Amino acid sequence: MRIDLLLKYLCLAKTRSEAAKGVRSGGVRVEGKAVKSSKEIKTGDILHIRYPEREIVIEIVELPRKQVPRKKREQFYRIIRERNL
């Protein structure tokens, strides 16, 4: 699954274009490396996501097939680290 679509489906970005913008700006990394928004993500991948106010590192546990409700999104990833900036 493309990283921009994954971020949208897991409610980690409001829109797919916002997710793509975050990836392009370097705010989203996979395994510590900068990627393109077309990067295919698989289970077990480690994502580093930087927001203006916080940074989180997550491991993808399962790939969603469609948009996930906010209350259920954390069953698809595991938070490794989270810190406020």
Write out the residue ranges for each language-model feature.
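Strongly charged
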Residues: 1-5, 9, 16-21, 27-85
